[in-house]
Curated annotation (Swiss-Prot):
It comes from Synechococcus sp. (strain CC9311). ATP binds at G117, T118, N119, G120, K121, T122, T123. GO terms for cellular component: cytoplasm. It catalyses: UDP-N-acetyl-alpha-D-muramoyl-L-alanyl-D-glutamate + meso-2,6-diaminopimelate + ATP = UDP-N-acetyl-alpha-D-muramoyl-L-alanyl-gamma-D-glutamyl-meso-2,6-diaminopimelate + ADP + phosphate + H(+). Catalyzes the addition of meso-diaminopimelic acid to the nucleotide precursor UDP-N-acetylmuramoyl-L-alanyl-D-glutamate (UMAG) in the biosynthesis of bacterial cell-wall peptidoglycan. A motif (Meso-diaminopimelate recognition motif) lies at residues 420-423. The lineage of its organism: Bacteria, Bacillati, Cyanobacteriota, Cyanophyceae, Synechococcales. This is UDP-N-acetylmuramoyl-L-alanyl-D-glutamate--2,6-diaminopimelate ligase. Belongs to the MurCDEF family. MurE subfamily. Its main location: cytoplasm. PANTHER family: MUR LIGASE FAMILY MEMBER, UDP-N-ACETYLMURAMOYL-L-ALANYL-D-GLUTAMATE--2,6-DIAMINOPIMELATE LIGASE MURE HOMOLOG, CHLOROPLASTIC.
């Protein structure tokens, strides 16, 4: 892929400096280490270093043009270079728009569906990908766990990639034959303009509960960051349609803002204002069955997924795909073949020994609402005690620690508080913060070492008990200080179950 520089700049509304050569552009990058002849380098401001300060090096390395912000220009004025453009803030917006133009606007050709919310993004996007592919429409997936499309799969490093890389990946997915893309869109990605240049033809709002207030400071600010997904310039055009969970108060507020452009989803009894609902729901240890009702018809379904929150994920995934023109009957049939997402209510088992051992589930629940939903989902399957093992991450919203503690104490029969990803905080102080939220009289164990906490909880559990290990889910690492060390809750749980059989 190549483009002429002048046409590229004009296409996104940037002026062309008089002395700027109309070079052939071969790459768009925000990484100064990737600059070479034919590159356009966009210097993004960062928390520690302003990438715009690397403009002299980028020119030395052969960049045809460099885009920087006002702060970098004030620190290191590019007065003698026509190849350096000082663009209006936010600079990240231009990275996305320019990369999208360079790659011929892949999001407008691939049926891009964004999913945002505090909880449920990963399962909902995986559902969208699975259901679409099962209905004969090859799909791509961009999310927390991985990025994949036909012939390609790679572990994701961020929920949403930086704009230049994201546009390149969308182009790769389209070239590989993907006709629809499901993308997790985090509030950080929206606030930092990582999805600039994308045009979404559909979007889903799952819910909004306390998280990331270390970054957004207030719930109102957090909500407005999420709401950007449903407004210009990110929506494709007036034809874009949305699915919004109105059982969530923030979702109800968003639905009122969007009006008839959204289908409202609800599992509440007698919700007369929802276009997407369920009826005749029966939940059991083997999953859920019921009827799905939509503006385009209704039908029965069966799913192996556990928990009421997963029913909402199903409802929203089907709804947004109906809006994209997929047939209801085929979607309902495909639901039964979706087996779930790694680390989301994932059962850890020793083959052939199910009746002798406690039920152990690993889940990513790391917010107050997520933990509440997971524990409520577990309760019907705990014939004995419900035991909750959890911790809270360091260098993150401290306000949710006591809330999660209170929820665990209320909904579980026994609570084991342990370390999560302490990062640069004192792990013991994090535990102290959590324990402060647990009322006296709670069956409480505090154990700093997460492996020992998991092993102890499973060792003490009876065959009719259920152990929920919450917080890390799919993660195969623990962040201690600034280092990642290998750690997988599922591996630790399996070892503990095997040891229980031996001893």
């Amino acid at each position: 892929m190549t483009q002429r520089l002048h046409a590229l700049l004009h296409s996104v509304g940037l002026p062309v400096p008089q002395g700027l050569s109309d070079a052939v552009i071969e790459s768009i990058t925000c990484d100064s280490r990737c600059v070479g002849p034919g590159s356009v380098f966009i210097g993004l401001p960062g928390g520690r270093v302003d990438g715009g300060s690397f403009w002299p090096k980028a020119l030395v390395d052969g960049a045809s043009a460099v885009l920087i912000g006002s702060a970098a220009a004030a620190t290191l004025p590019p007065e003698q270079s026509d190849a350096v453009l000082v663009v209006p803030d936010p600079v990240a917006r231009w990275a996305g728009e320019l990369a999208a133009a360079f790659w011929n606007h892949p999001s407008e050709r691939i049926g891009l569906i964004g999913v945002t919310g505090t909880n449920g993004k990963t399962t909902t996007t995986h559902l969208i990908e699975h259901l679409s592919s099962a209905c004969g429409r090859p799909s791509a997936l961009f999310g927390t766990l991985l990025n994949r499309w036909p012939g390609h799969s790679v572990t994701a490093t961020h929920t949403t990639a930086v704009a230049d890389r994201l546009q390149a990946q969308l182009a790769e997915a389209y070239a590989a034959g993907a006709q629809l893309t499901a993308m997790e869109v985090s509030s950080h990605a929206l606030d930092q303009h990582r999805v600039a240049g994308c045009r979404f033809s559909g979007a889903v709002f799952t819910n909004l509960t306390q998280d990331h207030l270390d970054y957004h400071e207030t719930m109102a600010s957090y909500f407005e960051a999420k709401a950007r997904l449903f407004a210009p310039p990110l929506v494709a055009d007036q034809g874009a349609q949305f699915v919004v969970n109105i059982d969530d108060p923030w979702g109800k507020h968003l639905a009122e803002r969007l009006g008839d452009r959204c289908w409202r989803s609800s599992l509440s009894e007698g919700s007369a204002h929802a276009e997407l609902t369920m009826s005749d729901l029966v939940m059991g240890s083997s999953g859920v069955e019921g009827r799905l009702l939509s503006p385009l018809g209704e039908g029965s379904f069966q799913s192996p997924l556990l928990g009421r929150f997963n029913v909402m994920n199903l409802l929203q995934a089907v709804g947004v795909l109906l809006q994209q023109g997929l047939p209801l009957e085929a979607l309902l049939e495909a639901i039964s073949t979706f087996r779930g997402v790694p680390g989301r209510m994932e059962r850890v088992v020793v083959d052939g020994k199910g009746g002798e051992l406690p039920t152990v589930l690993v889940d990513y629940a790391h917010t107050p609402d997520g933990l509440s939903s997971a524990l409520n989902a577990c309760r019907p399957f705990a014939d004995g005690k419900l035991i909750c093992v959890f911790g809270c991450g360091g260098d993150r919203d401290r306000g949710k620690r006591s809330q999660m503690a209170a929820i665990a104490a209320e909904l579980a029969d026994a609570v084991v508080v342990t370390s999560d990803n302490p990062r640069t905080e004192d792990p013991q102080q994090i535990l102290n913060d959590v324990v402060e939220g647990i009322p006296s009289g709670t069956a409480l164990t505090v154990m700093l070492d997460r492996a020992e906490a998991i092993a102890g909880a499973i060792k003490d559990a009876g065959s009719h008990d259920l152990v929920l290990i919450a917080g890390k889910g799919h993660e195969d690492y623990q962040i201690l200080g600034t280092q990642k060390v290998h750690f997988d809750d599922r591996e630790q749980a399996l070892k503990a179950l095997q040891d229980k059989l031996i001893f």
